[in-house]
Curated annotation (Swiss-Prot):
InterPro entries according to UniProt: GlcNAc_MurG, Glyco_trans_28_C, GlycoTrans_28_N
Enzyme Commission number, as recorded: 2.4.1.227
The encoding gene: murG
Record keywords, A-Z: Cell cycle, Cell division, Cell inner membrane, Cell membrane, Cell shape, Cell wall biogenesis/degradation, Glycosyltransferase, Membrane, Peptidoglycan synthesis, Transferase
Higher taxonomy: Bacteria, Thermotogati, Thermotogota, Thermotogae, Thermotogales
Pathway where this protein functions: Cell wall biogenesis; peptidoglycan biosynthesis
Catalytic activity: di-trans,octa-cis-undecaprenyl diphospho-N-acetyl-alpha-D-muramoyl-L-alanyl-D-glutamyl-meso-2,6-diaminopimeloyl-D-alanyl-D-alanine + UDP-N-acetyl-alpha-D-glucosamine = di-trans,octa-cis-undecaprenyl diphospho-[N-acetyl-alpha-D-glucosaminyl-(1->4)]-N-acetyl-alpha-D-muramoyl-L-alanyl-D-glutamyl-meso-2,6-diaminopimeloyl-D-alanyl-D-alanine + UDP + H(+)
Species for this entry: Pseudothermotoga lettingae (strain ATCC BAA-301 / DSM 14385 / NBRC 107922 / TMO) (Thermotoga lettingae)
Family named by the database record: Belongs to the glycosyltransferase 28 family. MurG subfamily.
Entry protein name: UDP-N-acetylglucosamine--N-acetylmuramyl-(pentapeptide) pyrophosphoryl-undecaprenol N-acetylglucosamine transferase
């Protein structure tokens, strides 16, 4: 089975795609072509984790807001020019899988042009521009939240399946860092804001253990002076890190909230103010409404406020892990739809 996949720029778009592809690979023999942004995280991660995937690197930039900015003309032209390269690969595929980010749009557009069925998966409460545009032609649309349905055109809502966010997991993986620690995550590229805030927290909080993914080796060195903090620049086997944690402090990106809900971990979500369309804030508020987390906005974030919320979170019960990974539901549905 030949698949053309796209989704990247950040881990929030990449990892859901990879988790679905990994589940599909358990059910069928796959031949995967993955369309990457030249400077996206997928261009670095996929050669390490899935060297068997054929990578096609495309030099694109996302549209600036508002969309009518003159600089977007050049960007739209590049997107259009990339379609001929994409078409050469998609001619060979059985179907497409897109998980958002602007690389998804030209890939989905070419699938439509060549009459290849394709599926989209949306991780955030408010869908991105690429997925909204592709929804009209998609065979099936997978979303993480019930609320997301209302943001899509009424004409496509009969194609939407609410599954939750797909998660990568290895059941036989041992816990990496022991157990009963607070997991601190700044997203796939790290967060200077969270790093700076937590450095101040570590100066006064010595009773709790922390595992902190910093995004850079410089921050690992800087935080190494704290005995109760295990700092790493990046956590490659995330499932092992989640299994030993008792709570999480993190941004509200799609990968994080998917794993948080899957592993039943309570936490503090600090939405990134710079996220497109405030999607992290909407994600965080939805999780808080579900009673699974507390939201801490950047403008309210102080050491005392964070610690107060952290001790509240530690009183919340850790829920049992989900019985079925949404990635499995999505993979099975795709195969059913293709029959």
């Amino acid at each position: 089975m030949r698949i053309s996949a796209a989704g990247g720029g950040t881990g929030g778009h990449l990892y859901p795609a990879v988790s679905i592809l990994e589940k599909l690979a358990e059910m069928k023999k796959l031949n995967v072509t993955y369309f990457c942004l030249e400077k996206g995280i997928e261009s670095k991660i996929l050669p390490l984790e899935h060297p068997e995937y054929k990578l096609i690197k495309i030099d694109l930039k996302g549209l600036e807001r508002p969309i009518w900015k003159p600089s977007n003309f050049t960007r739209l032209l590049k997107i259009s020019q990339s379609e001929s390269i994409i078409a050469l690969e998609i001619k060979q595929c059985d179907f497409g899988l897109m998980t958002g980010g602007y690389i998804s749009y030209p890939v989905g557009k070419v699938c439509k042009k060549l009459k290849k069925p394709f599926f989209i998966q949306e991780q955030n409460v408010v869908p991105g521009l690429a997925n909204k545009a592709l929804s009209l032609s998609a065979k099936k649309i997978f979303v993480a939240f019930d609320k997301t349905v209302e943001f899509f055109p009424k004409s496509v809502r009969n194609k939407i399946l609410v599954t939750g966010n797909p998660v990568r997991e290895k059941d036989n993986e041992e816990m990496l860092f022991g157990k009963d620690y607070v997991l601190v995550l700044g997203g796939s590229r790290g967060s200077e804001f969270i790093n700076n805030l937590m450095e101040e927290v570590y100066k006064v909080e010595h009773n709790l253990k922390f595992v902190h993914s910093t995004g850079s080796k410089e921050w690992v060195d800087r935080l190494s002076i704290f005995e109760n903090v295990k700092a790493v620049d990046y956590i490659y086997n995330a499932s092992a890190a989640w299994k030993g944690a008792r709570a999480v402090i993190a941004r509200a990106g799609a990968t994080t909230i998917g794993e948080m809900l899957y592993y039943g971990l309570p936490g503090i979500l600090v939405p990134w103010d710079g996220a497109t369309g405030s999607h992290q804030l909407y994600n965080a508020l939805e999780i808080e409404k579900m009673g699974k987390a507390l939201v801490l906005k950047e403008c309210d974030a102080t050491v005392s406020t964070l610690l107060k919320k952290l001790y509240q979170v530690l009183e919340m019960d850790k829920k049992p892990k989900m019985k079925i990974n949404p990635a499995e539901i999505i993979a099975k549905t795709i195969l059913e739809e293709l029959k």
